[in-house]
Amino acid sequence: MYPNWGRYGGSSHYPPPPVPPPPPPVALPEASPGPGYSSSTAPAAPSSSGFMSFREQHLAQLQQLQQMHQKQMQCVLQPHHLPPPPLPPPPVMPGGGYGDWQPPPPPMPPPPGPALSYQKQQQYKHQMIHHQRDGPPGLVPMELESPPESPPVPPGSYMPPSQSYMPPPQPPPSYYPPSSAQPYLPPAQPSPSKPQLPPPPPSIPSGNKTTIQQEPLETGAKNKNAEQKQAAPEPDPSTMTPQEQQQYWYRQHLLSLQQRTKVHLPGHKKGLVTAKDVPEPIKEEAPVPATSQIAEPLAAEEPPLPPPNEEMPPPLPPEEPQNNSSEMSEDPEEDARLKQLQAAAAHWQQHQQHRVGFQYQGIMQRHTQLQQILQQYQQVIQHSPHIQTMSLDVQLRHYEMQQQQFQRLYQEWEREFQLWEEQLHSYPHKDQLEEYEKQWKSWQGHMRATQTYLQEKVTSFQAVKNQYMGNMAMPPPFVPYSQMPPPLPTMPPPVLPPSLPPPVMPPALPSTIPPPGMPPPVMPPSLPTSVPPPGMPPSLSSAVLPPPSLSSAGPPPVLPPPSLSGAPPVLPLPPLSSATPPPGIPPPGVPQGMPPQLTAPVPPASSSQNSQVPEKPRQALLPTPVSFGSTPPSPYHPPPQSEQGNSKPLNKVFSSEQGLGESSSALSQSVIAAKDTPVKSGGLLADPPKGSFLEGPRGPREQKEQLQKLKDFGSEPQTADHLPPPDSRLQNTSRPGMYPPPGSYRPPPPMGKPPGSIVRPSAPPARSCVPMTRPPVPIPPPPPPPPPPPPPPPVIKPKTSSVKQERWDEDSFFGLWDTNDDQGLNSEFKRDTAAIPSAPVLPPPPVHPSIPPPGPMPMGMPPMSKPPPVQHTVDYGHGRDMPTNKVEQIPYGERITLRPDPLPERSAFDADHAGQRDRYDRDRDREPYFDRQSNMTDHRDFKRDRETHRDRDRVLDYERDRFDRERRPRDDRNQSYRDKKDHSSSRRGGFDRPSYDRKSDRPPYEGPPMFGGERRTYPEERMPLPAPSLGHQPPPVPRVEKKPESKNVDDILKPPGRESRPERIVVIMRGLPGSGKTHVAKLIRDKEVEFGGPAPRVLSLDDYFIAEVEKEEKDPDSGKKVKKKVMEYEYEADMEETYRTSMFKTFKKTLDDGFFPFIILDAINDRVRHFDQFWSAAKTKGFEVYLAEMSADNQTCGKRNIHGRKLKEINKMAEHWEAAPRHMMRLDIRSLLQDAAIEEVEMEDFDANIEDQKEEKKDAEEEESELGYIPKSKWEMDTSEAKLDKLDGLRTGTKRKRDWEAIASRMEDYLQLPDDYETRASEPGKKRVRWADLEEKKDADRKRAIGFVVGQTDWEKITDESGHLAERALNRTKYI
C-alpha cells in the first residue's frame, strides 16, 4: 500500500524524492544490478538516473500539481502535510524513509509479486522496512532479487502492498501520512532526510525534500528519517497527547484552509491532506493504498480506494513538487509557498482557538475510527497479487468471500459515518472542515460504490465465466508475463508513480533516466524516455532487447521507478507509467517492454524480457514494466520511443501542468519516437499522437485494469487486448487499440498503483507517446500470436470490462473510443495535462487516467493506463484509486462500468472523428482538469447513447452505467458537458490556455472534483447552482446546495445550540410590510437577552422613515388645543435608496467596531441586491449570516402593517419578489413564533391568577374593615351563615368561608363543639343559638393570638386564662 502511496500513496515516496537526489545514482547501482535485480535495483537506479528525470518529472509534476492544486487542492493537502512532515517520515511502510525509497525498487518487485506470493511480497516488505530502518537501502535493492516480493508492497501485489502498507505504517493514522511521507521519502531515496521531507506536505517539504533528497545519500539519515517518520506518524495522531493531537490537527486544518485560500482552490484536497496527516488523512491514504493494491488485482476494488488515493495523490503531487523543487524551476515557487504555509501553520498553531479544540479533537478521533475501518476495508479489498492469473472460479470465490467480509465492514462504516456526521454538524466551524466532510462523503460514496462494485464483480464473473474461459488461455501470455513478474513490480512502481511519477518521471525522463545508462537508447527515442532509453535502447534496437534492457537496464527505468517506485527496471517504467515512464519505460512499465513489442519482436521481446525479467522479478507478471514489455514488450519496445515519448509526455503532463508547450513538445517527441518505433506500426505513432496519447492515459489505467483483469481472467483478456490493440487499436488510432494494449499492461500498474494513480499517470503517458506505442503493443505482446483475437479486444474489454472496463468504459473508453469519449477521457487527461494540448492524443490519457492521477499518478500509471484503454473494470478501481484523479469524481459505478467499449468501435469513432478528437483533445487539454472530467462524464453519457455496442457489449456495463447515471444524474452530466463544450469552444482557440483559465467554469465542481468521489455530487449540486439563478448570486457557488441550508433559530439562541454557534452572527430579516419582521426581530433580541447574551443591535430601515410631526391635541384638563411633537412613520419612496445606503454604512461601521457580535437587519429586502451587499460585508468580516424570511399572505400583511402601506403596494411587491440565493443560509424562525404564541396564552393564564390574587387581597381588606367578604350572592348559604356570625358578634375570617375549602378548614372548630352544636350548625338556614361561652373563649384566643392592638385591645379578654369572662357571656342577652 505504501508504495502506492509513496507515489501517490505508499508507493509515491519513491518517485518524487529520487528526482531531486542526484546521489540516487548510487542507488542506481542497485538498480544497475541487472534485469533480475532490475526490479529492485531499478528503484535505486531510477533514483539516481531517475532523479534527473525525476527532476524533470517533478517539474512537470509540479505544474500538474499546481493545476491539481488549483483544481483539487491536493497541493494544499501537501501543505497540510508540511507541518506533519515529521509525520510523513513515518513512512513506516517504506521501512526506513530512505531505505524504503531504496526499496522502492523492491516495491517495484512487488509487482512481479503478483506472480510472487503475496506473502513473499510482504516478507520483502518487512525486510525492506528493516533494511530501511537499518538504513541500508541497498539491502532492499539486494532483496530485489525477490524485489517483486518487496515491491509487492507497492505494486507487487497491490493487496500485499496494502496489507504491508497497513501494517508497516504502525500508526494507522500515521500510516497514511507515512505513506505520504514515505512515498516522498522513497523519492528522496538518496537521502533519509528526504523521507522526512516526504512528509505528507510534499508541497511544503518540497524545499526540504530537495535538501533532503540531496542528503538521501546517507543511509544513516535515511534510517533516522525512517525512524522519525515512524515516530512522527505515530505521534501524529496516536502518540500525541490529546492536546498535541488537537494542535496538530488544528494546525493542519488551518494550513489547509490557508493553502486553499492561497491556491484559490476549493481546498477540498487540502483538507484531505490535512486529514491525511490526521487520522482522517491516514484513513484516506490507507484506503488509497489498499485501493491501489486492490486495484492492481481487482480494478473494481481498487476504485474504492481511489477516493482515498485521490486524496492521497493530491498530497503526493505537492510532495513531488517538493522533490521537483530540488531540480524543478517550479520547486522554488513551491518551496516559497511551502515556507509560507509552514510559517502560517506555526502562526496558526500559536493562535489556536482552544475553545473549539476539543470539539475538533472529537471529530478527528472520529476520523481515526473511520480510518481504521478504511484500513480494514483495505485488507478486505486486497487481492492476492496473482488473483488475476487465477481461474475465474477462484476469482469468483474470492470476490464472493470479499463481498461477505465487506458487508460487515460496510455496516460498521455506516454506523461510524453517521456518528461522525452528527459530530460534524454540531461543530461550530464545520464550514472549515468542508474538505474533511467532502472527503468522508466521497468515501461514503466510495464504500457504497464498492458494495455495488463487488456485487457487479461477482455477477460479472459469473456472467463472464463462460465468455472468458476461452480467453483464460490468454493467461499464458500473461504467464510469460508471469515470468515477467519481475516487471510486475514495475506495476507497483506505477503505483508509486501516481504520487511521485508525474514529477519524477518528467524530470528524470529527459535526462535523469538516461543516467541509468539505458537512457541513451531510451533517451534517443524520446527525451522523456531517458529512462526508457536504458531499457528502451534495446527495445528500440529490438523488441526483445528493450525488455531485457528494461529489466537489466532496470536501473534506467529505475530512475523512473524511483518516481514510480515500481519494478526497478520495470519499476522505472512503472514510475514512468505512473509518472509517464520517465525513463524509457513507457511509464506503465509495459511501455519499455512494449517498445519491443511495438517492434515486431513482440514475441521475442516477450521471451527476452520474460527471461530477463523473470530473473528480476518473476512476481510481477504484468505489472512489471518489463513484464509489460515482455508480454507486450515486442509491441511495446517499439513504443519505447513511444514510451520515451510517453515519458516525455509524462514530463509533458507534468510540464503540461508546467506548461502546455512542454507537454506539446514531449508529445511530438513521443510521437516522433513512435514514428521511429514505427516498427510496431506507423498507425500507432500517427494515431497515437491523436488518440494514442489520449488513449495512452486511458491505456495505462486500462492497462492496469486489463492487467488485473487478465490476472482475474487468467491473462486471456490480455491476449485479446494485446492482439487487437496492435492491430485494430493501432488502426483505431491506437487510441483504443494501443491503449487497450497498454491496458493489458495496465494491469501491472494496478498492482502497485491504485487505479486512480494509474489512471492519472495514464494521462501523462497519453501525453507521452507511450500510449501510442502502447496501442500498438497493447497487451498483445503475449497475445501477439493472438492478434487474431482482434475480436477479443472487445472481449478483452468485456473481460477487462468486468474488472477494468468497468471504469474504463466510462472513464477511459469514453475518451478513448469516441471523440466524445476522448473528450471525456481526454478532458480528464487534458486537465491533467492542460499543457499537453498540443498532443490531443495526450488528452485521452487525461481522460480517465489523468483524472485519477492528478499530477503524479498519471505519470506512474499513465504508461500502464495508456495501453489499456480497454481495461474496463480495473480502471474502475483506478479511477477511484486515484484520489487525485478526477476519475474519482466519476461515480464508482461509472468507473466500474463493465460495458466494454469495443475498442474497434471506439477506434472507428476515433478514426471518423480524428480531427474532432484532436480538437476535443485540445479543448480538453485547455480545459481544467475538473471541467474535463465533468465533460468526460457527459461525454460518457453521450457516448453511451451514441454507442450501443458498448451497452450491448455488456449488460453489466449498461447496468453499471445506469448505476453511474443514477449516481450522477444525466442532467449533471449534460450540464457539465454543456459547460465544457462552451468552455472547450472558447478554449479551442487557446490550446495553451492553462487549466487555471478554466477554473472559473469549474468552481462549482471544484470542491468535489478534488475527490473524485464527489465529482458526481458536484455536478448535481452545480445544476442546482445554476438554478439558484437569483442571477445575482454567483456567491451561491460557495454552498451549492440543492436545497438552501436552513438553521433553526433555537439552535442559535437556546442552549445547547448557542454554545456551538458562530461567534459572530448577522440575521437579515426579509418579508412584506406587515409580515412580522420587526416583531420577530424583537423576539430574537429578547430571546438572546433572556439567555444571557448582550442585546443584539437591530438596524431597521423603518427607523429612517420616522419623522417628528406636530399634532394638535386637546388638553383633558383645560380643554384647550395643544400642539405636541410626535414621532411618526412616514414612508417616502424617493428616500428609500438613500436610507438604505445610509443604513449600509451604519451596518459596516457596526461590523468594524466589533461591539455587537449579534446584529439584526430589519428591512423589506424584496430585492436580492438590497441585502446582498449586507451579506457580503458581514461574510467578509467573519460573521455567519442567516436569512430570516417571513411568510404571510398579502391580506394579513395589509391588515397588520402599521405603516399604512396599501394592499395594492403589498401585492405588487409580492409579485416582483426575488428569491434569495441558495448559498445563503436560511433561519427557521417558526419555533420562535410558536413560543411567542404559547407565551401569550400563558400570560393570560397568569393574568387570571393575578386577578384572583387581587380579589383575595380585596377580600382581606374588606374583612379587615368588617364589611365582610364580598359574597357571590346575597342569598347564598354562606352568606346567611356569615351574617349569623356577625349578628352573634363572632365575625370570623369570611375570606375562608368563601369557598367550601375554607369551610372544610374550619371543621376542626366544629368538631370541638357538642353534637347538638354541630347539628344546629348544619342547618344554616335556621336561626340558632350558639354557646356564648365557647364563642367567647374562641374570641379571646383569637385576640390573644393577634396581640395588642392600639384602641382595640380588650385586656380583659386577652388576660382571661380561666374562661370566667367567657362564662359570663352566657348571661348576656342578645337580640337578633
Curated annotation (Swiss-Prot):
Cellular-component GO terms for this entry: nuclear speck; nucleus
Any one GO MF annotation of this record: DNA-binding transcription repressor activity, RNA polymerase II-specific
Modification type N6-methyllysine: residues: 675
Tissues/organs with expression: High level expression seen in the brain, adipose tissue, heart and kidney, with a low level expression in muscle, spleen and lung (at protein level).
Compositionally biased spans, kind Polar residues: 207-216, 238-260, 642-671
Covalent link Glycyl lysine isopeptide (Lys-Gly) (interchain with G-Cter in SUMO2), residues: 886, 943
Leader sequence residues: none
Compositionally biased spans, kind Pro residues: 14-27, 81-93, 102-114, 148-158, 166-176, 184-204, 303-320, 511-537, 545-594, 632-641, 738-753, 773-796, 840-870
Keywords attached to this entry: Isopeptide bond, Methylation, Nucleus, Repressor, Transcription, Transcription regulation, Ubl conjugation
Pfam family, one: AAA_33
GO terms classed as biological process: negative regulation of transcription by RNA polymerase II; regulation of telomere maintenance
Region entry Disordered, spans: 1-335, 511-1058
Subcellular localization(s) per the UniProt record: Nucleus; Nucleus speckle
InterPro entries hit by this protein: P-loop_NTPase (IPR027417), YLP_motif_con_p1 (IPR026314)
Stored SUPFAM superfamilies: P-loop containing nucleoside triphosphate hydrolases (SSF52540)
Composition bias type Low complexity, residue spans: 31-50, 59-80
Record flagged with keyword Glycosyltransferase: no
Domain of life of the native organism: Eukaryota
Biased composition (Basic residues): 261-271
Compositionally biased spans, kind Basic and acidic residues: 277-286, 698-714, 896-930, 937-1004, 1013-1023, 1039-1058
Assembly with partners or alone: Interacts with PPP1CA and NCOA5. Forms a complex with ILF2, ILF3, KHDRBS1, RBMX, NCOA5 and PPP1CA.
Protein purpose: Plays a role in the reduction of telomerase activity during differentiation of embryonic stem cells by binding to the core promoter of TERT and controlling its down-regulation.
Protein name (Swiss-Prot/TrEMBL): YLP motif-containing protein 1
Species annotation: Rattus norvegicus
Gene from which this protein is expressed: Ylpm1
